[in-house]
Amino acid sequence: MTNLSLFAISHIFALSFCLVNITTIAETDIKLPEIQIHNVLSESAAPVKVQITGKPVILLKYNDLYKWNVTRNEIIYSTAIFGHYSANWHAFDPSSDAGHAISFWWITTDGIFQSFDNNNYELRAKWVGDEW
């Protein structure tokens, strides 16, 4: 009985080790992008406060660009505050953003826009607050 139990335990340990390694390999195969957030409001506009999950608050003045590399394949929540307005969006969403080299974000008067080629932008979040 002891030999069988030792045999079973050693196989369970080996199987667990293999599963952990397979999971690690699978996660490293996923290409995670660089994120670039660019304030393109206007030169006369007040700076925008941006809060990204796990990062300090960033103050972006006109034409400022903030960038970093995604390190985990999970949703990254973001909030931008501009005067009495706010907008919430996913700076990174694995279901749509993984596999792209760069995720470009523009902060504009209409809201937050995303592009993967830095040419074609799509609205991802509208400002919420008092009317413009």
What does each of the following model-derived ranges do?
Residues 2-73, 77-132:
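Intrinsically disordered, low-complexity segments enriched in small/polar residues
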